Amino acid sequence: DPDSHSPTLRNYHKFLWSKKLPNGLPFKLDETIPMRLHHKSDLGEFVLSSDSIAHTYSNIKSTTNIIKEIDTKELKKFVSLCSTIGGYIIFPSERINNQMTINGARGVNKKIRDRFDLTLECIRRYYIKEDSPLNETFERYKQFFNLFESFQGYVDFFLLQDLVTNDYSSIRYFIPFETFENYPLPNDIEEYKQYK
């Protein structure tokens, strides 16, 4: 969790996401739990931490050869962009029933591989009660997702409008997506450039 090592990032998140929820109630975050953000009210208690929206995939065996073909300056620029405040989001960070967190599940799921656009597709499906590779995980965290009331509420709260169509009915994928059966990472240099 990047913010566990960066008080600055944690403070930015606290500032950005301490605001009214879609139902008009305040969602005030504090730092009463070390290295985490925290909210406690009649809405429930949530311990939250950040997760990256974009990744270079430079440490993934299947993309190593592709990344070798990317100009070093271009890759550094992408890393820098991924490291801005817009490159992170918060999720609940406490395990429920000793199961994976959202952050962990989206990272290890071979159909998602930490791609945020695919995670957002899973979130969209969750709100309209369609199955997805992360549905079981999201069900454990339904109290968190209930805060936002709908997919549009979630997107608007976290300022993710650039990643969805104007009517919120579909995702603007980083690379083409048809089904979760397809390999989720870029297959060649052209797809990688499109992804970044």
Question: What name fits each language-model region?
Answer:
Residues D42-T84, F145-Q152, F158, V164-Y168, ...:
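Intrinsically disordered, low-complexity acidic Ser/Thr-rich regulatory segments
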Residues D1-I70:
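Intrinsically disordered, low-complexity N-proximal targeting/linker segments that flank membranes
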Residues R95-N98:
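Short, glycine-/Ser/Thr-/acidic-enriched flexible segments
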Residues K14, K19-K20, K28, K40, ...:
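Context-gated lysine
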Residues M100-K196:
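C-terminal, well-folded lobe of enzymatic/effector domains
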Residues G86-I89:
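Residues immediately within or flanking Cys/His clusters that coordinate Zn2+
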Residues P92:
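Hydrophobic, well-ordered secondary-structure elements that form the walls
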